[in-house]
Curated annotation (Swiss-Prot):
Location of the protein in the cell: Cell inner membrane
Purpose: Catalyzes the excretion of spermidine. Can also confer resistance to deoxycholate and SDS.
Protein's name in the database: Spermidine export protein MdtI
Species this protein is from: Escherichia coli (strain K12)
Origin: domain of life: Bacteria
């Protein structure tokens, strides 16, 4: 793997943000009944994968994907709480903690 460069971390951060945007648009689309939000969601997913493809040029795929997925889930959870009033129960919080612990383990491996 090439030496770490901040540009790859920036691409990964962009991929995470775009994934969150895609998920929020998907919720707004109401099961694709509101087509513009559905299309925006698809465009954001495509852009997220494009950014992820740039990130993996300098970050191991397993690490990049774990971080992308984990931070994407955690941030989407926060967006659901802020925008839609969605809350996690105790089991949900335990799952989130396990997810974050798994991300740390993958990064340290």
């Amino acid at each position: 793997m090439a030496q770490f460069e901040w540009v790859h971390a920036a691409w990964l951060a962009l991929a995470i943000v775009l994934e969150i945007v895609a998920n929020v648009f998907l919720k707004f689309s109401d099961g694709f009944r509101r087509k513009i939000f559905g299309l925006l969601s698809l465009a954001a997913v495509l852009a997220a994968f494009s950014a992820l493809s740039q990130a993996v040029k300098g970050i191991d795929l397993s690490v990049a994907y774990a971080l992308w997925g984990g931070f994407g889930i955690a941030a989407t959870l926060a967006a659901g709480w802020i925008l839609f009033g969605q809350r996690l129960n105790r089991k949900g919080w335990i799952g989130l903690v396990l997810l974050l612990a798994g991300m740390i383990m993958v990064k340290l491996a």
